[in-house]
């Protein structure tokens, strides 16, 4: 079977009286800093839209630390330069399942996909700067994410659009392969042997552990396990 869904969302009203100057409701608290929110509810936008600074990149496509687009044109970077950028909610949902039978063999599987959704990589924004590597209070070395060597940020850049990453994915939820044995030993016994893997694999461009996170913020989620099951069913 196959199914596909398209969803489009837009906030149409937040105040009792229409107020074009009302920016919206900040939400989406993140780890790092004090009281930082990375999302906003605004009229004309999707719920929980990311609210960040537009990152500037060098000619090689690398983000430049602390350099953002001055959207307000006032010559400095501040809250007036934050802008709505992408949505954590997928526009497209796909589901796929099927079963194949060949002789006494059978194969079944089920998968699903989300497309056009984005994730704020809070794990990377919190642990991806070089200043965290050496801790003088110990002194000791601390863990940082691998992209710290890619971006070479010396300090935290929590509101950089760099950390809002494509979260589209396809997940194969389970695959089962089985075989039916009939009339074992001539005594009329039947047996089915099957092997199943749950959370078989995932295809995604997301740089974090798993793009399927609540409200589009990846903040140290517990990894989903891959489970292997062997089933033997004997009938007399």
Model-found features: residue ranges?
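Membrane-embedded beta-strand positions in outer-membrane beta-barrel channels/transporters
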Residues: 1, 95-97, 174-178, 229-231
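Conserved small-residue
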Residues: 1-88, 208
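Membrane-embedded beta-strand positions of outer-membrane beta-barrel proteins
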Residues: 2, 109, 193-195, 232
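Transmembrane beta-strands of outer-membrane beta-barrel pores
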Residues: 4-10, 102-104, 113-117, 174, ...
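Outer-membrane beta-barrel and related beta-rich outer-membrane complex signature
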Residues: 9-30, 117-144, 203-211
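Extracytoplasmic gating/loop element in the C-terminal half of outer-membrane beta-barrel translocons
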Residues: 60-62, 114-198
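Repeated loop/turn-to-beta-strand initiation elements of outer-membrane beta-barrel proteins
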Residues: 104-108, 184-185
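Outer-membrane beta-barrel "beta-signal"
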Residues: 224-236
